[in-house]
Amino acid sequence: MAEELVQSEKLLSLDPKLQEDFQQKVHDIRRKRKANALTPGVIYIGHIPKSLIEPQLQEYFNQFGTVTRLRLSRSKKTGNSKGYAYVEYECDEVAKIVADTMNNYLFCERLLKCEFVTPEKVHPRLFIGCNTRFRKPTKPAVTRYNSKRNKEEVKKMTQRMISKEYKLRKRLAEKGIDYDFPGFAAHREMRKELTCDANTSVSSQDPTPVCTPTVLERRKSVRLEQIEDEEEDDDEVVLKLPQRDDEVVVKLPQKVSSAAKRQKISKLGKKTNIKELK
C-alpha cells in the first residue's frame, strides 16, 4: 500500500487543490487492475511423439491461447525427448479448456493425455531453464576412449591398468580372499609369446612369419621340388579306345614343363662343353 501511494504521488494533477482526490482515484484504478489480473494455468501433456520438439509444440498449442512458458522433458544422458511436457497458459480457464479438448486426441498415431495441473501441485522450479536453448551432451568420455593413441599413451594406459589390477589383487589378499583371475598382465605376456613364435616359425600351420627374401626363396625351391616329383611319377599317358578286333594302345609324348625344359637345356649345354674340351 505504501509503495502504491508513493508511486501515485509522483503523478500531479492540473489543479493543485485536487491533488489528494487525484491520487486516491489512481490508487483505486490500479487496485482494480490487480484484482482483475489473469491467473496462469498449467497443463500436463503426455504420450507426445518423439518427432515433436519445443518450436513445433509452441506453434501448435498457441492456437488455443497465449502460451507463456513451455517445458519439454528431455534425457540428460542422450538428449532425447521423454514423451511428456508442461505448458503454461496466460489464463487458467483457457488451460482447462485445452486439457478437456486435447485429452485422448489422436495425434501422429498416438493418443495424447492432457490434464490440468492445479496451482498447489505446480513445483516452483518446474519451468526453470525452459527458455534456454537445448544442447546435446558432448560425451567427453566416449570421444576420449575412441580417440587414437600413440605408443607413449598406449604404454601409460597399460601401466595404469596393470597397477590397478595389482592393487585389486592386493586388497583381495588382505581380506583373505583366495581368488585368481586372468588379468591384463597375463594377457600381455601371452601376446609377447605369440609374437616371438610368429617371428621364428616357418611352417604353414604356425602364425604368418615375417616375409624376408630368404624365406621367399626357400618356399620357391620347395614348390619346384614338389612339381618335379609329380612330373617323375607321370611318365606316360595311355588312352584306351573302344575295342574292335584288337586292343589299340596309343602312347602320347609327355608334356614337358618350363622348369624341366630349363633343366634339359642346361644339361645339353654342359655336354657340348665337355665334347669341345675333348
From Swiss-Prot:
GO terms for molecular function: RNA binding. Its main location: nucleus. It is found in: Nucleus, Nucleolus. Residues 41-119 form the RRM domain. SUPFAM superfamilies: RNA-binding domain, RBD. Keywords: Nucleus, RNA-binding. GO terms for cellular component: nucleolus. This is MKI67 FHA domain-interacting nucleolar phosphoprotein-like. It comes from Xenopus laevis (African clawed frog). The lineage of its organism: Eukaryota, Metazoa, Chordata, Craniata, Vertebrata.
